[in-house]
Amino acid sequence: MPSKNDLLSFRSEINNIDKNIVQLLAKRKKLVLNIAESKIKNNQPIRDIEREKILLEKLTNLGKKNNLNTNYITRLFQLIIEESVLTQKKLLNKFCNDNNLDLASFSFLGPKGSYSHIAASQYAEQNFKTCIENACLSFNEVIQSVENNQTDYAVLPIENSCSGFINEIFDILKKTNLFIIGEINISINHCLLAIKKIELNKIKAVYSHPQPFQQCSYFIKKFPNWKIQYTNSTADAMKKIVKYNITTNAALGSELGSKIYGLKVLYKNLANKKKNITRFILLSRKPVSISSKIPTKTTLIFNTGQESGALAEVLLILKKNKLIMKKLTSQNIYKNPWEEMFYIDVQANLSSSLMQETLEKIGKITKFIKILGCYPSENITPIIP
């Protein structure tokens, strides 16, 4: 059995190996940027799927020879390849739009510690050197701050894997003149938080935004005596229970928020589905130009009126033009319940002749159509060896 000194020696060696791994990843990233510049210069696509497959196959075979699990090597290098693609996309976007990536300001539903704050921080970290944060009290205030030229970008949650599309955002998108210029997916870990450790049956009131209550409904139903208190955001809920300082109060919020507000985590991962992801969109006053070399989405809303089969015709146009629909949802039109407004994500670049032709055809059979934006797709399809 190894002695304590042996254990410390082994751990020290592992620490050195981990340090070398990080340094090699940093060196790899520099080479990736050189490759991206070469691709831009020679007008080459960001991804080379065949090369990625060959690379991953060689690495998994090398892993086998060194007694490493194939799944482990696959997952590790899928993540490394994904980071390489995102790095190249960022550089290409800067080239296409001549953007200053040093500083940007973001508005989000606050206060700090909300999931919108987390999304804004992660997007800013990926794309800018410095971020100025503006926490807002409502989604409308988030939009207005950008419309009024107070901040550069608005961050809004648009759909959740547990609770679906957020209708309040649908209403905002119909009215605003801003454009969707990006998206980011955030893993949501709803936690039950309190001022101090407390037994669940002693909790009297739980505070949070309506969405977490909906996403954690299975857990909440187990405690019918809890009084549900709705707040503007999860972070607002955390601030409230700190302010009230009542030990029988609790909040649904993020683990990051618990650290910001000094709360105790009673339970983690309370969502109805284990994989709970919220998709956020970024909006700006100006649309962005997206290279044809980048996987892209175009988002639009339209109203077919009361014409029978009009939606089917729209979908048929997409099918005939071999365009992939990534999302379709609808909402009844206020004061006219017999009509619906449709929201659709199409895997295509707005500037392509095929997409322009498609929009022209759709425009002829719809009552209303609005392009919300064209932007890089957040999801990088992983390579399977």
UniProtKB/Swiss-Prot annotation:
Matching InterPro entries: ACT-like_dom_sf, ACT_dom, Chor_mutase/pphenate_deHydtase, Chorismate_II_sf, CM_dom_sf, CM_II_prokaryot, CM_P_1, Preph_deHydtase
- Ranges where the ACT domain occurs: 299-376
Residues of the Prephenate dehydratase domain = 105-285
Chorismate mutase domain mapped to chain residues:
1-92
- GO biological-process terms attached to the record: chorismate metabolic process; L-phenylalanine biosynthetic process
Task: Report keywords, A-Z.
Answer: Allosteric enzyme, Amino-acid biosynthesis, Aromatic amino acid biosynthesis, Cytoplasm, Isomerase, Lyase, Multifunctional enzyme, Phenylalanine biosynthesis
SUPFAM superfamilies for this protein? ACT-like, Chorismate mutase II, Periplasmic binding protein-like II
Put simply, this protein is called: Bifunctional chorismate mutase/prephenate dehydratase
Q: Which organism is it from?
A: Buchnera aphidicola subsp. Schizaphis graminum (strain Sg)
